[in-house]
Amino acid sequence: EYGGECHCPLCQKAFRNWLKEKYQTIENLNDKWCTTFWSHTYNSFDQIESPSKIGETQLHALNLDWKRFVTHQTADFIHHEIAALREGGSTLPTTANLMHYFGGLDYFKIAKEIDVVSWDTYPTWHKEAVIDTAYDNGMCHDLMRSLKGKPFFQMESCPTSTNWQSVSKLKKPGMLFAQSMQAIAHGGEGALYFQIRQSRGASEKFHGAVIDHYGGNDTRVFKDV
């Protein structure tokens, strides 16, 4: 589940170098970014800082290039992670948990670094807009399949109720089967569950699992799985 961004001095420097490579000159950057509007003209690349609450946020081109840079940095990080595995002798396919319509990264670029696309799906079933929820979840399946034009995996789905949605409802009988088959119907090759055994503690100790704190195999959820 890659995400987040860093605004430290090292990342600021890397961002400026990325901009230099893209635009070559500060004059060209000013022209492409239309910085003359509202007197945002830069005199050098060293004056540019990432958009943040304590900096500039009104230049659309700055915001867009920053997001592109964050994707570039993340993809480069994934590339080096995989390289380390390959150097260690692993030939297994690689993947990463993608997340819904996550706006922090360009998943089409991230998908180029991994062998198999997989994503975490946690739809909020059993609300008034259940049909819209099904449409939305199906659209995400289609998006994930389109990232590489190949079948994908549903990496995470909750077999019962989550611990973090505003109202975390237990799935009705048959709902887990329907949700899993929706992934297969949209081009998926597998539907996996998080988690197999409920955590003993920490943030997700009340997150649903195939085997709950009771520990038995005679629960409805276990039988549904």
Which residues are covered by each model-predicted region?
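Polysaccharide-binding and catalytic clefts of secreted carbohydrate-active enzymes
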Residues: E1-M139
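Carbohydrate-binding surfaces of carbohydrate-active enzymes
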Residues: T41-P51, T91, A111-D115, Y122-V225
